[in-house]
């Protein structure tokens, strides 16, 4: 049985301003080189496009549910894009439940997803943690952020860096 590894691929790595093809090519090579012994679930974040859409909805007073839903849509769009970048077309689409992930993982070595079902205050990183716990798999967080913060440092100037956790 292949070991499952769950990766959170930050949207800022996929599309910092433009698509980062150089990074994505190296990422693809690394993942595909390791499918002999591992299966991967790659959870894609929404990145700056999600933040821009959410900001636009905030500006017109849209509620948090609608803001979350546009963020979820961005994560799923990024997941679809990255799957195509890997030259993979997940024939049943982007999974949106743990049960669907289970089914996909039985058939594929690499599964791409974004956020799953709507939950208040959910992020792609918390989704990745939930998926990793479900599969009893390691969680690797790939991001442009320099470390762990109390809040998103891009959105909150009072975010504090956490240098150590136990």
Describe each model-derived feature in a short phrase.
Residues 73-98:
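Ordered, amphipathic secondary-structure segments that act as subunit-interaction surfaces
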Residues 6-10, 44, 112-115, 142-143:
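Short beta-strand segments
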Residues 58, 91-104, 109-110, 119-121, ...:
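Active-site phosphate/oxyanion-binding loops
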Residues 54-75:
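A charged helix-plus-loop insertion that forms the helical arch/lid used to bind
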Residues 126-135:
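Acidic, metal-associated active-site segment
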Residues 1-41:
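N-terminal glycine-/serine-/threonine-rich phosphate-binding loop
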Residues 64-70, 115-122:
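A short glycine/serine-rich beta->alpha loop
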Residues 13-15, 47-51, 147-150:
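Short, active-site-adjacent cap segments at secondary-structure transitions
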